[in-house]
Every structure is written in C-alpha cells, then in structure tokens.
Amino acid sequence: MPTAPVSTTPAADKAAEKAEVKTYFESTGFDRWNRIYSTSDDVNKVQRNIRIGHQKTVDNVLAWLQEQGELGRRSFCDAGCGVGSLAIPLAQLGAGSIAASDLSEAMVQEAERRAGEAGIAPCRISFLASDLESLSGRYDTVICLDVFIHYPQQPAEEMVRHLAGLAEQHLIVSFAPYTPVLAVLK
C-alpha cells in the first residue's frame, strides 16, 4: 500500500537541515574538515585546494584587520570557527576579545585544544558550541568564513541577516556557493 507524502513546515525543514549539518560535523565531517585544516598530507587534491583557499582567506582577513588598527581595543565574533583557523591567529595578534563558536562540539573541542597548543590562555578566546542563529551579543567585527556552503540559499541568507545584526562596525563573510557538485567533492 502506498504511503502518503509527509508534509513538513518551513520550521521543520530548517530544523532538519540544521540537524543534518550538526550530525555531519560530529562524525564524518569532523574527521574530514579537521584533516583539511591540519598539516596532514592525508588529503585529496580537492581537499588540498580547499585548505589552500581557506588559508588565503584567513590571511587576507587578518591582514585587513591589522590595517584597520587597534586590534586590542576591538571585539570579534568568529561565527563557525571550526578548528580555530581564524580565532587562534587573531588572538596571537592581540585582539581584544574573541568569541568563537561552531555548531559542532567536536570542532569547538579541537579549536580549544589547538589554542592550548599555540599557547593561547583560555581567557583569550571564549569558545562556544552554538548554531549561528542562537549567537547573541554585539561585536565590533563579526566574521563567518566558509560556513554557508553547508546550507541552502534561504537559510544562509537568514543567517547572514542575523550576523549583520550582531556587528557594530563590520561583517566579513566568505563562501563558496552551495552546489551539488561542491557538496559531493568536499
């Protein structure tokens, strides 16, 4: 006997998308992205290109922030911090306060571990496992790098609007468009 199609609401769809991303980053995704953002040679060509591109983006953002001056007087939110690729060097440059969050508890734990290895005192970066929509507070600069590839366009647009509301001065966002091809290759 055929089953009736299940109707869902936009809120249910959004919750399902978020749960799917979270589950991915607590398992296979954590292993994959932790390896990409490490110095391991155990990456394929696409992953190596992602690593190189991400590092270029981080370097460009850090250079721009330094050009703005007074890092020590400014507050930063690294939304979707992953393993700390931006938050850690930002702390090393003397940034005032840094709130770094990621949907994945595993990513946050790895970021904390890497910060400790880099000699960053725990009080220098406030790490939090949180989805982007739940972030609150006001920051001079909110930065969200390479997160939105994991979301369809509509939820990504809503997240950008939310992050813009947290930024006093600057919102810095980078992304690759979500496409089925990129989703498979990542």
Language model features: what each stretch is:
Residues C77-A79, S85-A129:
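Class I SAM-dependent methyltransferase SAM/SAH-binding core
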Residues P2-D41:
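N-terminal, positively charged/glycine-rich alpha-helical extensions of SAM-dependent methyltransferases
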Residues Y151-H162:
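A short, conserved alpha-helix within the catalytic core of class I
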Residues D146-V147:
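Short catalytic micro-motifs in class I SAM-dependent methyltransferases
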Residues I143:
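A conserved beta-strand element that flanks and buttresses the S-adenosyl-L-methionine
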Residues R51-G72:
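Conserved alpha-helix/loop element of class I SAM-dependent methyltransferases that forms part
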Residues A167-P177:
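Conserved beta-strand signature within the Rossmann-like core of class I S-adenosyl-L-methionine
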Residues V181-K186:
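Short, glycine-/aromatic-enriched active-site segment of Class I SAM-dependent methyltransferases
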